[in-house]
């Protein structure tokens, strides 16, 4: 008997969930420079995976998702994310931590629990589709 091959979206969702779990784990660690750096790096990975998932969902529904902003707007417009979510701030903070040297790392670190919650809500809605 053949097993059902998971779709690209299912695979991306499982990777998204894995990244959420790792972000949650690192946020529960002590607040040393090492773990703060690890949390910021994990945030970057989770953000990237979020966009991959949004692009896959948008593509499968023939919806626009060319830029980060457009992907998040598509998610809001289709009820995948809350309208008041902090995605604009999240996108700006993602850009800040990816500058060399990273900008405002301590400030961004302080927002990661909120961003994790936003990612988790998005994951729950997408998984239910």
Residue map of PLM features:
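Solvent-exposed interaction patches of small proteins and small membrane subunits
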Residues: 1-129
């Amino acid at each position: 008997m053949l097993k059902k091959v998971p779709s690209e979206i299912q695979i991306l969702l499982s990777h998204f969930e894995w990244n959420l779990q790792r972000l949650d784990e690192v946020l529960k660690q002590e607040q040393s420079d090492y773990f703060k750096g690890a949390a910021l790096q994990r945030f970057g990975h989770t953000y990237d995976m979020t966009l991959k998932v949004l692009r896959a969902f948008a593509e499968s529904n023939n919806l626009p998702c060319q830029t980060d902003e457009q992907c998040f707007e598509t998610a809001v417009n289709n009820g995948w994310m809350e309208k008041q979510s902090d995605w604009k701030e999240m996108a700006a903070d993602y850009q800040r931590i990816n500058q060399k040297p990273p900008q405002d790392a301590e400030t961004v670190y302080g927002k990661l629990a909120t961003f994790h919650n936003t990612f988790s809500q998005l994951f729950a809605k997408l998984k239910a589709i």
